[in-house]
């Protein structure tokens, strides 16, 4: 373009120079007619003026263009402007040379401007010669820029296609993730992908549970001729697709392609592509990281239509791969949600079962507590009353036989009270075990009382009774007196109930180590523990049934033999259970209990071996009945005249406890509730030194009464002593925390009551 402009300007300058020549000597012009010399000169003059005007306007336009644009080679344009201006001046001066003689000045200026025009035109021509190579280089660069523009257009087109693909994939992904149901996700994928890629058909194949077959579970256009399609998982195309991460183009005769086309072999179909989709489940994840497990794969098959000879493009393949990844993620999320819902349902069922179990346990616990309260009220309290009365009888003056009978009754009642406490206070967390109450006691007294009870039972049931007690038995031993007496009573009852009357019962007590060879064989078989320390002693209790050698002929004895006996031969389960419980008790006391059968399996004797810790003792005959007490009782002078308030809601127990306190010389005011106790303490005229409270009173229990007493009466006086039937250890600690000074555990015995009162008074006076 610039070269054409330069050539045009050069030709224009040459014509201007030619037109400025005024030498008309050789002109042979005709002066007649319209085209006369004068007319021609006028036309040339007008033309020169118009050319001058045009030459003067063109530089102005170029100057305006240069001032408002940034074009290269401005100095070339400046040369053109000078050349055009000089040409214009030449034409302007030449217009005055057509009439008459010319002045010297006009010819001089015309010559000067022509000379300048010649110089400028030559300079411009030379400049164009140097500029043409640069212009040619510009042309090459223009071609290069055109090539770059074409490449940029291709890249822009690719970016537009990628953007379009991303938009389509995003729309498809949004449609897929609208649902969290696996079947809806797959159905939506097939429909939307078919719209985007203009597919003839699409299908999804799922593996079965055993991973031996691929089942056609979802299809865009199902073939009505076949309702179910199965392909073996070891099919070559299936294996190839499952082992490849990218899209696989299937063969025309592929079973997977034919079965997924929806044509059934009757119609043509286009190229078929297949890609695998991992089917991850929630169990494959731990902390968000998949385990290295054999992941099952589904296969998505996409079929193009046969028209227009379409093939799979890179864009379509990329869309299929991206969609397959998105479907795998969506299905894994749906699987996790489904499994979480199932887990939530299972947890809900378990929670409801736990709530029902908790309610049942609370109801059972409530029923157990209610039963314990009823049993405590119906069994404990009467037994506590009996024990309290017997303790009063023990302090009275009696004959030796009466004292033995009262002591036997006291011991039996104590054992029965312990059994009742075991039944009522036993806790499931204790596994049915009862704690031992180990203390020092008189073994002679225990044997004497057991023999008294055994003789009474034997005579009542028509048996004779004999007693064989070793004289060198120690008196003071350490062990559980109640449990020992309980086991001995069980042996007597068991032997008497398992045989008929008319025989003799022998109650034998010996020191271990002096028995027969049969006893030694028992020890050798490990029936009791023999590896104890030297300061322990083994005592063997035995109850044996023997035939009467010379039966008495008096009527009383004969009458006793016909007394009906209670027998339990048909209740072997209860007998075994009782024997097992007694064996556990004996083993807890480092001993054992067993039965020695005679001929034909008939029970004839029962042995019990127990271990006791020995202490220095006074060895006296048991039958003499004058064994000393463990300790001499302290004087009750400190208790005489002591003002005591007794609060117990049970009338019988309150009366017995009041009688025990009065026997100790105390002045007792008995009330039946906590409110009456507080009213009695508010009486200024009566200054009570001791308050005895039953902890299980209704309306206001003993703890609440004690708290109110300490709040209004002070922290030191009156002394507060609790009465409770509970055997739990934490009760005493709670009593001390509530400001009480002592605790007496029911049954209330006379010597226990006196000892606790003396201890509390002595502690308070210190």
UniProtKB/Swiss-Prot annotation:
Gene Ontology CC annotations of this record: endoplasmic reticulum; endoplasmic reticulum membrane
Keywords assigned: ATP-binding, Copper, Disulfide bond, Endoplasmic reticulum, Ethylene signaling pathway, Isopeptide bond, Kinase, Membrane, Metal-binding, Nucleotide-binding, Phosphoprotein, Receptor, Serine/threonine-protein kinase, Transferase, Transmembrane, Transmembrane helix, Two-component regulatory system, Ubl conjugation
Tissue expression notes: Expressed in embryos, etiolated seedlings, leaves, roots, inflorescences, stamens, pollen cells and tapetum cells. Moderate expression in carpels.
Location(s) in or outside the cell: Endoplasmic reticulum membrane
Topology term for the membrane: Multi-pass membrane protein
Single Gene Ontology MF annotation: ethylene binding
Phosphohistidine, modified sites: 377
Protein name: Protein EIN4
Organism: Arabidopsis thaliana (Mouse-ear cress)
């Amino acid at each position: 373009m610039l070269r054409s402009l330069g050539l045009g300007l050069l030709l224009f300058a040459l014509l201007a120079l030619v037109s400025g020549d005024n030498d008309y000597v050789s002109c042979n012009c005709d002066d007649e007619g319209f085209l006369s010399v004068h007319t021609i000169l006028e036309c040339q003059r007008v033309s020169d003026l118009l050319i001058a005007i045009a030459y003067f306007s063109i530089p102005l336009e170029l100057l305006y263009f240069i001032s408002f644009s940034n074009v290269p080679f401005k100095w070339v344009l400046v040369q053109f402007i000078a050349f055009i201006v000089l040409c214009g001046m030449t034409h302007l001066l030449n217009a005055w040379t057509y009439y008459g003689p010319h002045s010297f000045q006009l010819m001089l200026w015309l010559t000067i401007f022509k000379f300048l025009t010649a110089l400028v035109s030559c300079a411009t021509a030379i400049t164009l010669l140097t500029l043409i190579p640069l212009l040619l280089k510009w042309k090459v660069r223009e071609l290069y820029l055109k090539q770059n523009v074409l490449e940029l257009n291709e890249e822009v087109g690719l970016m537009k296609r990628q953007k379009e693909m991303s938009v389509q994939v995003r729309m498809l992904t949004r449609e897929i993730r609208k649902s969290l149901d696996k079947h809806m996700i797959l159905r939506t994928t097939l429909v939307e992908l078919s719209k985007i890629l203009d597919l003839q058909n699409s299908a999804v194949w799922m593996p079965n549970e055993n991973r031996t077959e691929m089942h056609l579970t979802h299809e865009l256009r199902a073939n009505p001729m076949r309702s179910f399609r199965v392909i073996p998982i070891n099919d070559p195309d299936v294996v190839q697709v499952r082992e490849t991460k990218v899209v696989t183009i299937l063969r025309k005769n592929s079973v997977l392609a034919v079965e997924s086309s929806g044509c059934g072999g009757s119609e043509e179909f286009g190229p078929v592509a297949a890609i695998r989709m991992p089917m991850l489940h929630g169990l494959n994840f731990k902390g968000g990281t998949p385990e290295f497990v054999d992941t099952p794969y589904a296969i998505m098959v996409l079929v193009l239509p046969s028209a227009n000879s379409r093939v799979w493009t890179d864009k379509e393949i990329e869309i299929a791969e991206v969609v397959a990844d998105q479907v795998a993620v969506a299905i894994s999320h749906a699987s996790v949600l489904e499994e979480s819902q199932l887990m939530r349902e299972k947890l809900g069922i378990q929670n409801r079962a736990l709530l029902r179990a908790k309610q049942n346990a609370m109801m059972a616990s409530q029923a157990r507590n209610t039963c314990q309260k009823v049993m405590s009220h119906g069994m404990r309290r009467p037994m506590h009353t009996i024990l309290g009365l017997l303790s009063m009888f023990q302090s009275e003056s009696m004959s030796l036989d009466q004292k033995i009978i009262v002591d036997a009754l006291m011991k039996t009642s104590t054992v029965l009270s312990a059994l009742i406490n075991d039944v009522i206070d036993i806790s499931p967390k204790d596994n049915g075990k009862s704690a031992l109450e180990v203390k020092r006691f008189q073994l002679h007294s225990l044997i004497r009382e057991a023999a008294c009870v055994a003789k009474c039972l034997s005579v009542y049931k028509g048996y004779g009774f004999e007693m064989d007690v070793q004289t060198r038995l120690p008196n003071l031993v350490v062990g559980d007196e109640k449990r020992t007496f309980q086991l001995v009573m069980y042996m007597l009852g068991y032997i008497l109930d398992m045989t008929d009357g008319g025989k003799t019962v022998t109650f034998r007590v010996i020191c271990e180590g002096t028995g027969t060879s049969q006893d030694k064989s028992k020890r050798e078989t490990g029936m009791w523990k023999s590896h104890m320390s030297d300061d322990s002693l083994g005592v063997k209790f035995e109850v044996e049934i023997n035939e009467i050698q010379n039966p008495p002929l008096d009527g009383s004895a004969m009458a006793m033999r016909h007394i009906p006996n209670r027998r339990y031969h048909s209740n072997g389960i209860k007998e075994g259970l009782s024997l097992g419980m007694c064996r556990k008790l004996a083993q807890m006391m480092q001993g054992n209990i067993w039965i020695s059968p005679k001929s034909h399996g008939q029970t004839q004797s029962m042995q019990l071996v127990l271990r006791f810790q020995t202490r220095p003792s006074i060895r006296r005959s048991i039958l003499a009945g004058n064994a000393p007490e463990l300790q001499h009782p302290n004087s009750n002078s400190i208790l005489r005249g002591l003002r005591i308030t007794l609060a117990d809601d049970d009338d019988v127990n309150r009366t017995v406890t009041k009688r025990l306190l009065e026997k100790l010389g105390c002045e007792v005011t008995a009330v039946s509730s906590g409110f009456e106790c507080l009213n009695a303490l508010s009486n200024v005229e009566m200054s009570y030194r001791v308050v005895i409270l039953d902890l299980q009173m209704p309306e206001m229990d003993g703890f609440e009464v004690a708290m109110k007493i300490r709040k209004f009466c002070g922290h030191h006086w009156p002394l507060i002593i609790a009465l409770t039937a509970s055997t739990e250890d934490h009760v005493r600690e709670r009593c001390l925390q509530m400001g009480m000074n002592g605790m007496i555990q029911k049954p209330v015995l006379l010597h226990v009551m006196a000892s606790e009162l003396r201890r509390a008074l002595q502690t308070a006076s210190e």
